[in-house]
Amino acid sequence: MTAGIDPVIRPIDRLSICTVLDSAGATEDERRADTEMKFGVLRDLIGLSDAALTKQLGVLETHGYVRRVREYGSTRAKDKVWVSLTASGHRALRAHLAALRQIADTVHEI
C-alpha cells in the first residue's frame, strides 16, 4: 500500500469522523485548550447510527486517534459523550490526506 495511507483511517466512515472533528476544531492541541464535539452532533453530521458511530469510535480510540469523555447525567439517557481528535490522530489524518493528494496528483499527471 502507498506510504502514508493509514489502514485505521482508510475506511470512509473513520476518515469522515476524523475530518469532521478536525474541520470543527475538535482536536487536542498544545497551543490551545482542548475542544470537543458532542456525540450527537458528530452522528448527525456523518449520518451514522449511534451503534455504527460507537463502533467506529471504538476502533479509533483503541489506536489513540480519538478520545471520548462521558459526562454523566441523572439518567443514562441524559449522559453526554464528548469526542475529540487526539494529537496523534491529527498527525495520522494529515499524513493520510497528504498520501491521498499524492496519489491524486500522480494519477492526474498520467
Model-based region annotation:
Residues 59-62, 93:
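N-terminal processing/targeting junctions
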